[in-house]
Amino acid sequence: MPVKFDATTIIAISHNGENAMAGDGQVTMGEKFIMKGTARKVRRIYDGKVIVGFAGSVADAFNLEEKFEKKLSEYSGNLQRASVELAKIWRGDQQLQKLEAMLIVMDEKEMYLVSGSGEVIAPDDGILAIGSGGNFALAAAKALKKHATQVSAKEMAKTAINVAGDIDIFTNHNVIALDFKEED
């Protein structure tokens, strides 16, 4: 049975021309115990030009991240095209259909949620969230975008994960947040 990141929270935010993504560090084995508190579920790929965050089975998420990076190379860094092509092969391959993970991918201009059922979703409001604490983080991010307009996208993402961590028992406060302003 693969180890799952079901109990995780990932959020991506576009605000005032900035894009940022954040995730917590908790890995829960089933619903029984915390296996690790410092996992890195948000990372840079494609020479730092793309940020990817994942929820789901650890092995499956790494497999999909690798396939996504190959698609990025194949399509010269075109995030939308790479996302659509990954979703096509993910949905069309019986072995890949068994993978249990979701990805959020972003570059400096756009972001997408990519799932195994073939969805590639771009948000209307510049916010995407996945994982067990995703709805809590999403609500926090929406409030921040509306009422704390001076806050950076990266700070909003961190705060949203921390709010989720206050509510969701499967999300911790070991937040990794990345943006495109600096190498983290």
UniProtKB/Swiss-Prot annotation:
Domain of life: Bacteria
Enzyme Commission number(s) of this protein: 3.4.25.2
PROSITE patterns in UniProt: PROTEASOME_BETA_2 (PS51476)
Subunit structure: A double ring-shaped homohexamer of HslV is capped on each side by a ring-shaped HslU homohexamer. The assembly of the HslU/HslV complex is dependent on binding of ATP.
Mechanisms controlling activity: Allosterically activated by HslU binding.
Cytoplasm found in the keyword field: yes
HAMAP family referenced in this protein's UniProt entry, alphabetically: HslV
Protein name, entry field: ATP-dependent protease subunit HslV
Catalytic reaction(s) noted: ATP-dependent cleavage of peptide bonds with broad specificity
Subcellular location as annotated: Cytoplasm
Top enzyme class: hydrolase
UniProt gene name: hslV
Residues annotated for Na(+) binding in this entry: 165, 168, 171
Functional summary from the UniProt entry: Protease subunit of a proteasome-like degradation complex believed to be a general protein degrading machinery.
GO biological process, one term: proteolysis involved in protein catabolic process
